[in-house]
Protein backbone atom coordinates (compact mmCIF):
# COMPACT_ATOMS: atom_id res chain seq x y z
CA UNK A 1 0.00 0.00 0.00
CA UNK A 2 0.98 3.65 -0.42
CA UNK A 3 -1.53 5.07 2.07
CA UNK A 4 -2.31 3.71 5.55
CA UNK A 5 -4.88 5.02 8.03
CA UNK A 6 -3.61 4.69 11.61
CA UNK A 7 -6.50 5.43 13.99
CA UNK A 8 -5.12 5.68 17.54
CA UNK A 9 -2.52 2.98 16.75
CA UNK A 10 -0.61 3.29 20.03
CA UNK A 11 -3.24 4.67 22.43
CA UNK A 12 -3.67 1.57 24.63
CA UNK A 13 -0.01 0.55 24.65
CA UNK A 14 2.64 1.05 27.28
CA UNK A 15 5.23 3.76 26.52
CA UNK A 16 8.02 1.33 25.55
CA UNK A 17 5.78 -0.53 23.10
CA UNK A 18 4.49 2.82 21.77
CA UNK A 19 8.05 3.87 20.97
CA UNK A 20 8.75 0.58 19.19
CA UNK A 21 5.59 0.85 17.08
CA UNK A 22 6.26 4.50 16.20
CA UNK A 23 9.85 3.70 15.23
CA UNK A 24 8.62 0.80 13.10
CA UNK A 25 6.07 3.07 11.39
CA UNK A 26 8.77 5.65 10.62
CA UNK A 27 11.13 2.97 9.31
CA UNK A 28 8.44 1.53 7.04
CA UNK A 29 7.53 5.02 5.90
CA UNK A 30 11.10 5.74 4.82
CA UNK A 31 11.76 2.33 3.23
CA UNK A 32 8.45 2.04 1.38
CA UNK A 33 7.63 5.71 0.79
CA UNK A 34 4.35 5.37 2.71
CA UNK A 35 1.87 8.07 3.60
CA UNK A 36 0.01 7.79 6.91
CA UNK A 37 -3.16 9.44 8.07
CA UNK A 38 -2.31 9.33 11.77
CA UNK A 39 -5.32 9.97 14.01
CA UNK A 40 -4.46 10.51 17.66
CA UNK A 41 -5.25 12.47 20.79
CA UNK A 42 -1.65 12.03 21.99
CA UNK A 43 -0.09 15.26 20.77
CA UNK A 44 3.47 14.24 21.68
CA UNK A 45 3.13 11.23 19.37
CA UNK A 46 1.60 13.42 16.65
CA UNK A 47 4.48 15.88 16.93
CA UNK A 48 7.03 13.06 16.73
CA UNK A 49 5.65 11.16 13.75
CA UNK A 50 3.94 13.80 11.58
CA UNK A 51 5.24 16.09 8.85
CA UNK A 52 1.90 17.85 8.48
CA UNK A 53 -0.83 18.32 11.10
CA UNK A 54 -4.54 18.94 10.86
CA UNK A 55 -6.37 19.97 14.03
CA UNK A 56 -10.05 19.05 14.06
CA UNK A 57 -12.92 20.32 16.16
CA UNK A 58 -16.39 18.80 15.93
CA UNK A 59 -15.50 16.89 12.77
CA UNK A 60 -14.00 19.79 10.82
CA UNK A 61 -10.47 21.04 10.28
CA UNK A 62 -9.72 24.32 12.07
CA UNK A 63 -5.97 24.50 11.41
CA UNK A 64 -3.49 22.76 9.11
CA UNK A 65 0.18 23.12 8.35
CA UNK A 66 3.68 21.80 8.84
CA UNK A 67 4.04 20.13 12.21
CA UNK A 68 6.83 22.42 13.40
CA UNK A 69 4.83 25.52 12.40
CA UNK A 70 1.63 24.41 14.13
CA UNK A 71 3.39 23.40 17.34
CA UNK A 72 5.57 26.55 17.40
CA UNK A 73 2.77 28.96 16.50
CA UNK A 74 -0.77 27.65 16.98
CA UNK A 75 -3.27 30.21 15.68
CA UNK A 76 -6.81 28.90 16.16
CA UNK A 77 -8.18 29.39 19.70
CA UNK A 78 -9.01 25.66 19.92
CA UNK A 79 -5.48 24.67 18.85
CA UNK A 80 -4.04 27.06 21.46
CA UNK A 81 -6.24 25.54 24.18
CA UNK A 82 -5.41 22.01 23.08
CA UNK A 83 -1.67 22.65 23.07
CA UNK A 84 -1.80 24.44 26.43
CA UNK A 85 -2.77 21.05 27.94
CA UNK A 86 0.40 19.29 26.72
CA UNK A 87 2.51 18.39 29.77
CA UNK A 88 5.87 20.13 29.95
CA UNK A 89 8.94 17.86 30.27
CA UNK A 90 10.40 20.21 32.89
CA UNK A 91 8.32 19.94 36.10
CA UNK A 92 9.35 23.48 37.11
CA UNK A 93 8.30 25.02 33.79
CA UNK A 94 5.00 26.83 33.81
CA UNK A 95 2.49 27.04 31.00
CA UNK A 96 -0.71 29.04 31.05
CA UNK A 97 -3.53 26.52 30.63
CA UNK A 98 -6.45 27.68 28.55
CA UNK A 99 -9.58 26.16 30.06
CA UNK A 100 -12.47 25.78 27.66
CA UNK A 101 -15.86 26.73 29.03
CA UNK A 102 -19.29 26.95 27.50
CA UNK A 103 -21.52 24.40 25.86
CA UNK A 104 -20.06 21.57 23.80
CA UNK A 105 -22.23 21.50 20.69
CA UNK A 106 -23.77 18.32 19.34
CA UNK A 107 -21.96 17.02 16.25
CA UNK A 108 -25.37 15.92 14.95
CA UNK A 109 -26.75 19.45 15.33
CA UNK A 110 -23.80 21.86 15.19
CA UNK A 111 -24.33 25.58 15.77
CA UNK A 112 -24.49 28.11 12.96
CA UNK A 113 -21.30 29.97 12.15
CA UNK A 114 -18.01 28.80 13.59
CA UNK A 115 -18.59 25.48 15.35
CA UNK A 116 -16.20 26.53 18.13
CA UNK A 117 -17.90 29.84 18.96
CA UNK A 118 -19.86 28.42 21.93
CA UNK A 119 -16.57 27.75 23.75
CA UNK A 120 -14.30 30.44 22.32
CA UNK A 121 -13.03 33.23 24.59
CA UNK A 122 -12.35 35.37 21.51
CA UNK A 123 -15.79 34.93 19.94
CA UNK A 124 -17.05 37.88 17.92
CA UNK A 125 -20.57 38.46 16.59
CA UNK A 126 -19.59 37.27 13.09
CA UNK A 127 -18.48 33.92 14.57
CA UNK A 128 -22.07 33.15 15.60
CA UNK A 129 -23.44 33.54 12.07
CA UNK A 130 -20.73 32.90 9.50
CA UNK A 131 -18.49 29.85 9.18
CA UNK A 132 -14.95 31.18 8.63
CA UNK A 133 -13.11 30.36 5.44
CA UNK A 134 -9.60 28.85 5.63
CA UNK A 135 -6.99 31.62 5.60
CA UNK A 136 -3.48 30.96 4.31
CA UNK A 137 -1.11 32.41 6.88
CA UNK A 138 1.96 31.60 4.80
CA UNK A 139 4.02 28.52 4.03
CA UNK A 140 0.91 26.33 3.87
CA UNK A 141 -0.24 27.17 7.42
CA UNK A 142 -4.03 27.57 7.20
CA UNK A 143 -6.52 28.55 9.89
CA UNK A 144 -10.32 28.80 9.91
CA UNK A 145 -10.93 31.74 12.24
CA UNK A 146 -12.45 35.19 11.84
CA UNK A 147 -9.64 36.63 13.99
CA UNK A 148 -7.49 36.35 10.86
CA UNK A 149 -9.98 37.77 8.34
CA UNK A 150 -8.37 40.23 5.97
CA UNK A 151 -9.15 43.83 6.86
Stretch-by-stretch model annotation:
Residues 1, 5-95:
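P-loop NTP-binding/switch modules centered on Walker-like glycine-rich loops
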Residues 66-151:
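Short catalytic/signature loops enriched in Gly
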